Amino acid sequence: MNIPQVVSPQEWRAARQNLLAREKEVTHAKDAVDAARRELPVTEVTKDYTFTGPGGQVSLAGLFGGRRQLITYHFMWRHEQSGFPDEDQGCPTCSFLADSIGDLSHLHACDTTLVLVSRAPIASIERFQKRMGWAVPWYSSAGSDFNYDFHASFDEGKAPLEYNYKDKETLQRETPYIRSGTDGPGVSVFLREGDQVFHTYSAYARGLDSLLGTYRWLDLTPLGRQRHVTGFPYRDTYDQEP
């Protein structure tokens, strides 16, 4: 196995200090971007969306659970309509991300609710959630325009084809796998003020990188990420890898 250059402790320290300066530049740049994100304008959500959870139907406002902020992760689902005729389960890449979600107490203490949303029947969601052992609340948006309006599911009969702020022409040229009938991963954030709900932010594709906890740890190592994000299987199937 090839390893990085072997040097003296003094040389290593000098190289590490050089990298530290670059890391601090990135940290300061990220601080500025995070501040700009908090200052984004918002749009009011006036459309009624209905979701189905373990306790029955709930509105978008109901997903907040009485808190002021709501983060929804658009969890892709594998089924016949999305091009997987022999499957009825969550996307393995979205599962890789969900495996990084820990206890939600700290989010709740900051007046923030995190939920997963999928365009799948609630019975299928509950079966898969039990298999994976996740405690994060998970809702079905089946029959709702929610996924389409926030550009995480694609049906030109419901909404113009758009993903990651790219129009249909750009998508057909750059990412032809984004097409009607499919889903895309994403996260959408909402703020509640009394009875009003506002959409504040949505991110897709590489914009979700910071949510991948496994990558955060691997990025600290000399071998790095090693696998593309789509190369991670369901965590309970590693013993089936060749």
Give the label of every model feature segment.
Residues 1-110, 127-133, 137, 144-242:
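Non-globular targeting/processing and membrane-anchoring segments
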Residues 109-125:
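Catalytic nucleophile loop
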Residues 118, 140-142:
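Residues at the C-termini of beta-strands that transition into short coil/loop
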